[in-house]
Amino acid sequence: MIIVTGGAGFIGSNIIKALNQGGREDILVVDDLTQGEKFSNLIDCEIWDYWDKQPFLQAIKAGEEFPHPVDAFIHQGACSATTEWNGRYMMENNFYYSKRLLHYCLERRIPFLYASSAAVYGCGLTFQEHREFEAPRNVYGYSKWLFDQYVRRYLPTASSQIVGLRYFNIYGPREAHKGAMASVAYHAHCQLKETGRIKLFEGCDGYEHGEQRRDFVSVADAAAVNLWFLEHPNQSGIFNVGTGQAQTFNEVAQAVLAFHGHGEIEYIPFPDHLRGRYQSFTQADIHALREAGYAEPFALVEKGVKTYLDWLGKNQD
C-alpha cells in the first residue's frame, strides 16, 4: 500500500493518477475535504481507502500500524498559499505535520517522499540545493525550508529513503480548486474565455512588461519524478523539480493565445504589496536530479500548456 497525503489536491491527485496508470490501486488517500470541490480530482482515480487528515494524524501520533504493509509515504499535504501569513497555521500544517510523518517512516524504514518548494530560494538568482542560496521571503517558504533543514540532519544516517522535491511553478490538470494560487496558464485560459484578454503584470525588478521569468513545469513531469524515486529507493536527498529553463509570462500567455487562436494581452500595474517579495526569476538547477539518474525530458511551455489546455477542453470547459 502507498499512502498519499494531500491526495485530493493538485499534485497529489496527479501522482495517484500516474500510479494508477502504472498498475497501482492500493492507495490510501489522506486529505481534508472541508473544501469539498476537491473530491472531483479523485473521480477518475482508483484508490483503496480515504482517511481524513485528523484521524490519520492521531493514528500516526499513537504509533498505530495500518491494515496493510506500507510501501511508501508520498507526502503532498500542506498549506501551499504563498500569501498566507498566519505563521502558527503554516507551521502546524507544513512543519510539525511533516516531522511526525518523517519519524513514523524512519522508525519503520518506510520510504518517505515529500513536497518542498522553490519558495525556499526567495528572491535569489541561484537555485541550487545548498544552504547559501536559500533565503525564503514568506512564511510558506520558511516552513518548507525549515523542514528541509530538519531532514538534512537525518539524511546521513537514515536507513530508509528520504526524498524532498522542490517544485518550481507547477501547472496542469486538477488545479481549479486552488483559486488565486492556480497557475498562470490556468488563469490565462479562464480570463481569455471570459473577456478575450489575458492580464499580466507590468514590468518590475528591471524586467519589461510580462518578461518576468519562471521555471514552469508540467504536473505530469512532477508526478513522473515522484514515481521514479519510488522505483529507485536507494536514492535519497533534496532535489529541484523544474525544466531547468526559465520562460517568460509572455510565453505562457502566447501559448494560450496560440491554442485559442484569438485574444490579446493586457498589462496591469504591479501590486505594491508584492514588491520585495515577488520572485521575478526562477530557474531550477537540475544537476543533482540528473546525477541521481533521472534522465527523462521535461516539457517546455509551448508543449506543456497545449497538452494542459487540451485536457481542460475535454474535462472542464
UniProtKB/Swiss-Prot annotation:
Its cofactor is NADP(+). It catalyses: ADP-D-glycero-beta-D-manno-heptose = ADP-L-glycero-beta-D-manno-heptose. Pathway: Nucleotide-sugar biosynthesis; ADP-L-glycero-beta-D-manno-heptose biosynthesis; ADP-L-glycero-beta-D-manno-heptose from D-glycero-beta-D-manno-heptose 7-phosphate: step 4/4. NADP(+) binds at residues 10-11, 31-32, 38, 53, 76-80, 93, 144, 170, 178. Its EC number is 5.1.3.20. Keywords: Carbohydrate metabolism, Isomerase, NADP. Binds 1 NADP(+) per subunit. Pfam families: Epimerase. InterPro entries: Epimerase_deHydtase, Heptose_epim, NAD(P)-bd_dom_sf. One of its GO terms (molecular function) is NADP binding. SUPFAM superfamilies: NAD(P)-binding Rossmann-fold domains. NCBIfam families: heptose_epim, PRK11150.1. Catalyzes the interconversion between ADP-D-glycero-beta-D-manno-heptose and ADP-L-glycero-beta-D-manno-heptose via an epimerization at carbon 6 of the heptose. Belongs to the NAD(P)-dependent epimerase/dehydratase family. HldD subfamily. Homopentamer. This is ADP-L-glycero-D-manno-heptose-6-epimerase. The lineage of its organism: Bacteria, Pseudomonadati, Pseudomonadota, Gammaproteobacteria, Chromatiales.
